[in-house]
């Protein structure tokens, strides 16, 4: 989710509930998934919605090959430059909530040259197809900022170490703390769903999107034209971390940069 959706921790659940339920959900919801059906690219709202919902179903059933190579952040690095795709502008310093991020160079490599930069970013990052921001005064941007490495973790139940070369699709890591376990359980519970709605700004129903959360440290690229659904390595920066904004770019400028 994510460059990414912004997530807030939910009310902590009792530990005796979290571990068995989380384990069951991971096994039920946990081979690199097959790409979505190939064919001529279409971008009508109904086609995009169908493509996106298929990606959620695919991401929810994990296989051993989900455990693929990830971008590792060496333990000796103190600060890391990250980016987030958002309609809410620059994040506050310190961060007011957990923020999903990726490495700007890896994201730019996949979106460069795409005719629709916003849609390309949404597909690469595993975000729902949203042609316009939720409020008229908002604008989609990519914010690049610097954070301490120690404030980052991989959203991976098999291990959250950002220096690891991959996540595992087997058992839960014994090193997960209560806060991270609750965060990951919330991701699974709120990601694997379709067909839900919520009241929009005009009082009418709007989609309450799920997400193709892989739980394996990489985003699900739901672009049907992509050779693989493996997107980019994704990370989460914890609430309260200091964040120094380096640049705010339009999606078009970010994806078109050399």
Which residues fall in each region the model found?
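Active-site or metal-binding loop neighborhoods of secreted/extracellular toxin and effector enzymes
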Residues: 164-258
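Structured loops at beta-to-helix junctions and adjacent beta-edge loops in soluble globular domains
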Residues: 3, 84-85, 146-148
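ADP-ribose/NAD+-binding catalytic cleft of ART/PARP-like enzymes
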Residues: 34-102
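Residue-level signal for mature regions of secreted extracellular proteins and peptides
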Residues: 23-24, 248
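ADP-ribosyltransferase catalytic core
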Residues: 95, 105-163
């Amino acid at each position: 989710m994510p460059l990414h959706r912004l997530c807030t921790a939910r009310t902590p659940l009792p530990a005796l509930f979290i571990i068995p339920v989380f384990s069951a959900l991971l096994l039920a919801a946990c081979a690199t998934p097959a790409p979505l059906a190939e064919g001529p690219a279409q971008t009508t709202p109904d086609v995009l919605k169908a493509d996106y919902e298929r990606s959620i179903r695919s991401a929810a059933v994990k296989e051993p090959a989900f455990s693929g190579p990830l971008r590792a952040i060496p333990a000796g690095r103190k600060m890391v430059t990250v980016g987030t795709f958002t309609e809410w502008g620059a994040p506050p310093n310190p961060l007011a909530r957990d923020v999903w991020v990726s490495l700007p160079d890896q994201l730019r490599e996949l979106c460069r040259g795409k005719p629709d930069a916003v849609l390309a970013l949404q597909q690469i990052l595993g975000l729902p197809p949203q042609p316009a921001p939720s409020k008229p005064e908002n604008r989609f941007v990519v914010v690049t900022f610097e954070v301490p490495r120690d404030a980052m973790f991989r959203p991976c139940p098999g291990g959250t170490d950002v220096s690891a070369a991959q996540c595992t699709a087997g058992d839960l890591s014994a090193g997960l703390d209560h806060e991270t376990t609750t965060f990951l359980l919330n991701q699974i519970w709120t990601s694997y769903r379709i067909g839900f709605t919520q009241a929009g700004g005009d009082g009418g129903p709007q989609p309450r999107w799920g997400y193709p959360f892989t739980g394996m440290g990489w985003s699900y690229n739901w672009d049907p034209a992509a050779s693989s659904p493996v997107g980019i390595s994704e990370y989460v920066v914890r609430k309260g971390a200091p964040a120094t904004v380096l640049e705010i770019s339009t999606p078009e400028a970010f994806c078109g940069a050399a």
